[in-house]
Amino acid sequence: MCDPQRDEELRPVPKERAVLESFFTQLGMFWFDRAKDYVEKEKDASKSAGAIWGSLLAALAHLAAAEKAYHNMTFLGQKLGGQSFFSRKDSIRTIYTSLHNELKKVVSMGRHAPGGSTPNLEELLPHLSEQLCHFTQARMEIADFYEKMHTLGSQKTVNSEELVGALDSILQKYSSRFHHPILSRLESSFQVEVDVLTQLLRCQAQISEWHFLPSLLNLHGAHSKLQAWGQVFERQRETRKHLFGGQSQKAVQPPHLFLWLQRLQATLLAKFSFYFHEALSRQTSQSEMKTLTARTSLDYFGKISGFIRKYDASNVSLVFDNRGSESFQGHGYHHPQSYREAPKGVDQFPAVVSLPGGERPVTHWPNVIMIMSDRSTELNTLDKVVHFYDDKVQSTYFLARPEPHFTIVVIFDGRKSERDSYIVAFLQELIGSLRNSKPFTSLKPGSKG
């Protein structure tokens, strides 16, 4: 007796389905040019096939080109009208809108197609096209999101929580809207990209609130996903022939978007290592901690230590203003049900990092808090370096604020000029890096950030 299910499994895969699976596999491997050439050749070889098949292949060639432009981020920061009509590159929204319209035509053709010899194909192609319509809409919204992030690079503060909310709403809107097995590589790459970006933005928001464990979990989650994503490029080797014979293989260069996400993760790791240096130091030796922080993209601890040695600073501290923070319990991780009385007085302004000794300079702390209070308006502009000399203790204080809850304090014995260009430049560079908005500027290829 025949088993219908087994017969179905053994039946050869229709050629069209095999072409589609091969195309989306190539797209999932980020072989954009190869995928485009593949469907264009298939279209030329299938001119006698039905109109709906030819139309879908043409749309898929445009999809490969759109995905290449998207992942290389070449659309960011384009000025409309800045180029001549013939040389102006279409915006990413224009490209995906045009693609969306092509796919809608395929859907419409499928609805009006007469019953033919391949009814399954006549059903499959419009169904895939409909799901790809949702995908192109999702891409347009994420591209708009990157445009917004790019413009935020020039601002003093970035509301990461607001960005996470916007990203979450896009994800919920398009969740399971392009779920066909043939599109699984496309769906997977979309999901990983949005997950990584969400976790990194959440991490940025949580570091700014000095929340150790949530920051750590999001940073680790993004790192793990980026590593898995990076394996796709590591496994791809391209052969290069040398001028005088011989050849070598090297990993394929990942697209700009992936490299940018890696850089954002690296800058957040550096900031995390600095803000939570005390908690992390408890897990290893001092020499090992020094080695580990030196490997970060920006070694804040080493940079500040070098500044102290060169300019004979008495102390550099990162002060956390925990007023209004109900969850504040001090360095590291604390059990959710553990109770600790809310800090009062000077304890509302702990030095979460203090160099060179690791302990805040107690005798100077009332002065530090007084300056932070009296000069709060200047500090809240987030680009002002505040100077104060106290004749009684013969000490000079420089203060600057990278973000609302944190203030960098530099203390010198004796008098220092408020016009000391090196000290001011050092602090401005430091708070600019800690603000972590520069990576948003570098979203655009060729930008410094």
Swiss-Prot record:
GO cellular component terms attached to this protein's record? KICSTOR complex; lysosomal membrane
Q: Which superkingdom?
A: Eukaryota
Give yes or no: UniProt keyword Membrane.
yes
Signal peptide (from-to):
none
Keyword annotations from UniProtKB, A to Z: Lysosome, Membrane
Subcellular location per UniProt equals: Lysosome membrane
Q: What happens when the gene is disrupted?
A: Morphant embryos show edema, otolith defects, impaired left-right patterning, and reduced ciliary length.
Main location, first listed in the record:
membrane
- Tell me which SUPFAM superfamilies the record gives: FLJ32549 C-terminal domain-like, FLJ32549 domain-like
Q: Name one GO biological process term.
A: cellular response to glucose starvation
Q: Does the keyword Membrane apply?
A: yes
Q: What is the role of this chain? A: As part of the KICSTOR complex may function in the amino acid-sensing branch of the TORC1 signaling pathway.
Q: What family is reported?
A: Belongs to the KICS2 family.
Subunit structure and binding partners: May be part of the KICSTOR complex.
Which protein, by its recorded name, is this?
KICSTOR subunit 2
Q: Which organism is it from?
A: Danio rerio
